[in-house]
């Protein structure tokens, strides 16, 4: 993170992006577990792609309706993989997960939009501000909502926390948001659900967790098909914009 080479207005906006995409998002996300089972939370996260494409279009002051079609196919693929019986008393939890989805989608879209708008490419100099915003929100949430008397992690739990903070979150979010700036917004939206089969494969290979392979293959195929469809949709819009 650098100070002199970064536009102060951009730095402040990236702080706000981090505060929303990680900070506020995780408040909604973890709170939802008080109302939903794990598989229900996982199921309701599949709607994030809709938020990504709609919010990015809103920031760009445009509306590419066909993007919703390819994104819907990706959502269907994720639904095939993750569908399970739903608890009848899930409305509060559902809304909390959608709040998390909205924050995560807004963060990705805003980050991509801001870097395009400012023409800033040296993301390593900027991304620290993302975590400044995220840390500010999570620190306040921990003070207000946390119970530090119960925080007594074992060595293995501490190691997991360090890994989650340095690798999964720090490196992971940097690479994800950097990638978001390299691809079309529809591809970014679809890839949010491509994480689902990837996570299941990791659990299957490394931790031998049970998985419905038929659903995994069918859902993954639909997500792949959504990418093929989206590539054709991108070409359609490119040709139309050239004519205009």
Where does each model-flagged region fall?
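Helix-helix packing/entry segments at the starts of transmembrane helices
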Residues: 26, 40-47, 111-135, 169-205
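Transmembrane alpha-helical segments that form core, pore/gating elements
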Residues: 1, 52-53, 86-146, 244
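Hydrophobic transmembrane alpha-helices of multi-pass small-molecule transport proteins
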Residues: 63-83, 193-194, 213-234
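Specific transmembrane alpha-helical segments of multi-pass solute transporters/efflux pumps
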Residues: 2-39, 80, 166-183
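Hydrophobic/small/kink-forming positions within alpha-helical transmembrane segments
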Residues: 18-23, 27, 49-54, 105, ...
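Cytoplasmic-side transmembrane-helix entry/capping segments in multi-pass membrane proteins
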Residues: 10-16, 63-74, 94, 121-129
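C-terminal transmembrane-helix exit sites in multi-pass transporters
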Residues: 1, 29, 48-69, 197-216
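Membrane-interface helix-cap regions at the ends of transmembrane helices
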Residues: 1-8, 21, 54, 74-89, ...
């Amino acid at each position: 993170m650098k100070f002199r080479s970064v536009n102060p207005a951009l730095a402040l906006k990236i702080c706000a992006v981090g505060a929303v995409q990680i900070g506020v998002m995780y408040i909604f996300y973890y709170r939802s577990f008080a109302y939903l089972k794990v598989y229900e939370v996982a199921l309701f996260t599949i709607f994030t792609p809709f938020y990504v494409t709609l919010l990015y279009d809103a920031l760009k002051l445009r509306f590419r309706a066909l993007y919703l079609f390819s994104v819907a196919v990706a959502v269907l693929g994720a639904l095939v993989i993750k569908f399970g019986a739903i608890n009848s008393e899930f409305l509060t939890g559902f809304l909390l997960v959608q709040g998390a989805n909205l924050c995560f989608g807004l963060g990705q879209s805003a980050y991509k939009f801001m870097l395009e708008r400012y023409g800033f490419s040296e993301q390593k100099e900027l991304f620290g501000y993302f975590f400044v915003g995220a840390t500010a929100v999570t620190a306040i949430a921990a003070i207000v909502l946390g119970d530090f008397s119960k925080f007594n992690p074992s060595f293995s739990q501490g190691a997991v926390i360090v890994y989650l903070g340095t690798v999964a979150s720090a490196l992971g979010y940097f690479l994800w948001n950097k990638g978001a700036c390299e691809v079309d917004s529809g591809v970014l939206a679809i890839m949010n659900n491509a994480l689902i089969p990837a996570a299941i494969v990791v659990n299957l290979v490394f931790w031998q967790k049970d998985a419905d392979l038929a659903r995994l293959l069918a859902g993954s195929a639909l997500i792949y098909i959504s990418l093929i469809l989206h590539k054709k949709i991108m070409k359609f819009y490119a040709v139309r914009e050239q004519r205009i």
